[in-house]
Amino acid sequence: MSKLPSNLLEQYRDEGYIGAVDVMSPESALKIRQKLEAFEATQGGALHANQRSRAFLLFKWLDELIHNPAVLDPIESLIGPNIMCWGTIFWIKEAGSKSFVDWHQDNTYWGLSSRRVVTAWFAISDASEQAGCMSVIPRTHVGTTLEHEDTYDENNMLTRGQRIVNLDTAQAVSMPLRAGQMSLHNYCLAHGSGPNLSDDRRIGVSMHFMPPDTQQQVVEWDCGALVRGEDTHGHFSHTPRPQFDMDPECVAFHAKASGALRDVLYAGAKEKLGRL
């Protein structure tokens, strides 16, 4: 798929999401999985907490993914030709794990001024309902942001275990993906996911795109990757591109970038659980 057709643009505007956009073949997604798991093997286990966020600075293949036209063409349809990637986050649920993501709206704690931020959630492995795929509640991206509370639940993958208070989930829509597909949703949309009850890891990565006129309202310094077009605003420092995995220049920049993200996400929190 290149640019989004009018019916999907209308759905995104009205409902706040689009499901199952093809990015690459399952075979190509498997190659990405193999690269990720080969890196995990070199360090003796799963990604460390600080490696989960903004890892496009660590892995060349993830930098290539956020620049992939099959990702960016649909994004351009939604926010225009000038696109910055604010960050990426890995969402890995081990087979049979209790990990889940409670219902939440990302605009409550990302500190971004724009309501036009788009999350592209890319499936590195199959994300079925059994495996704990993401679900959304249509139309919650418009109007007043819903009340959230911090629970610090040890199984909630969010930074402070946040959840929406007294949410009616009767209209929830599941968005299963095969490996190599992505879903799109406005970051103001209520979304969440259940535990992985399958016998395989559920591996995904979220990519967060914004127009360059967006501003960070929580910390003085923040960064992003200019992935298409131009940035005439200069609100975010531009990130370097890795020439190979664990490029020393980018690893050093990542330490600062991931630290800034933690400062944003944990702002006002009573506890810092160290999940990113």
Indicate where each model-derived feature is located:
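Non-heme Fe(II)-dependent double-stranded beta-helix
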Residues: M1-L112, E149
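Non-heme Fe(II)/2-oxoglutarate
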Residues: T42, L189-L276
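Proline-centered turn/helix-capping motifs that create local helix->coil transitions or kinks
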Residues: A41, I79, D126-E129, H141
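Double-stranded beta-helix
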Residues: E129-G194, T214
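Short, surface-exposed loop/helix-turn segments at secondary-structure junctions
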Residues: Q105, L158-D168, D199-R201, V219-L226
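Short, conserved beta-strand element in jelly-roll/cupin
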Residues: H104, G111-E129, P176, L184, ...
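Feature marks short, surface-exposed loop/turn motifs that line or immediately flank catalytic pockets
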Residues: E27, E94, S128, G143, ...
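Residues that flank catalytic or metal-binding motifs in active/ligand-binding sites
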Residues: L58, W86, R116, Q130-G132, ...
